[in-house]
Design a protein with these regions (language model features):
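Conserved N-terminal beta1-alpha1 strand-loop-helix module at the mouth
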Residues: 1-81, 87-92, 104
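N-terminal active-site wall of soluble small-molecule enzyme domains
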Residues: 65-104, 115-127, 139-145, 162-166
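Catalytic cores of alpha/beta
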Residues: 93-102, 141-150, 184-202
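Glycine-enriched alpha-helix->loop->beta-strand junction motifs that scaffold or abut catalytic
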Residues: 53-54, 77-80, 106-108, 128-132, ...
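Short beta-strand/loop segments at the ligand-binding rim of alpha/beta enzyme cores
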Residues: 29, 76-87, 125-135, 170-181
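C-terminal helical cap(s) of enzyme catalytic domains, especially alpha/beta-barrels
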Residues: 5, 122-127, 169, 190-195, ...
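Glycine-rich phosphate-binding active-site loops on the catalytic face of alpha/beta enzymes
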Residues: 85, 105-117, 152-165, 195-217
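Catalytic beta/alpha-barrel core
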Residues: 34-41, 56-63, 84-91, 107-116, ...
């Protein structure tokens, strides 16, 4: 057998899956319950979640977390789900209940957004048996007290300053598991990994953008057939 040969099984119907950038494989990965995660797709689009080669999905959205949304994503996904349960608006007992619900439905981790109070993080940590991931939006985020409250992994989403922010926290926390947004291209992803990110979140093209590309392909096919 050829060394490093990795057989790939693919059907004709699934060949258009959303593939994450190959450069993400350079990341060390984070092992959760024996499974290694390098690529984490950032979407709540069930169609994309069902058609991607990412290792996991981070399901957070700009609305209050709701059990129906969490349940729908987990049921549809064929990869592990990290579910959003708390943020600036949703906290306290509701977040703790959301954490319990997410775990009961099969989430592999729960995510708390940047503004989440430490008391809420502690409340979630006390009732779940899965990792708590805290989103970090800048190097000015006070993460020490959040780590003490039960956060196991940080998810850095600092826009254009992400690489600098990853480097900042990696220097101060050499062993801390870090997920980070990779940016728009392979170069920024690689820079993020080099700065110390263990895993990368990837934002896929929208459903509309993917459909537009496919429709263009169909139009070209029709044109070619008409001009033979």
């Amino acid at each position: 057998m050829v060394e490093n040969n990795i057989p790939e099984i693919m059907t004709e119907l699934r060949q258009d899956i959303v593939r994450v950038p190959k450069v993400i494989k350079k990341a060390s990965g984070i092992v959760i319950f024996g499974k290694k995660f390098r690529s984490i797709i950032f979407t709540t689009d069930i169609a994309i979640i069902r058609n991607t080669d990412a290792d996991a999905v981070i399901a957070v959205y700009p609305f209050t977390p709701h059990p129906a949304i969490t349940k729908s994503i987990i049921e549809a996904a064929d990869i592990p789900v990290f579910s959003g349960v708390a943020g600036g608006l949703t906290n306290g007992k509701r977040s703790a209940y959301m954490g319990m619900f997410a775990e009961a439905q099969g989430s592999l981790a729960v995510v708390v957004n940047g503004p989440t109070p430490v008391e809420t993080i502690q409340a979630v940590y006390d009732v779940v048996d899965i990792p708590v991931i805290a989103t970090v939006t800048s190097k000015y985020s006070k993460i020490e007290e959040k780590l003490a409250a039960g956060v196991a992994i940080i998810n850095i989403s600092a826009g254009k300053d992400t690489v600098e922010t990853v480097k900042y926290f990696r220097e101060r926390y050499p062993e801390l598991p870090i997920i980070a947004t990779g940016g728009p291209d392979d170069e920024t992803i690689e820079a993020t990994i080099d700065a110390g990110a263990n895993a990368i979140t990837y934002t896929p093209p929208s459903n509309g953008a993917l459909f537009s590309k496919k429709m263009e392909k169909y139009r070209k096919k029709e044109y070619d057939e008409d001009h033979q």
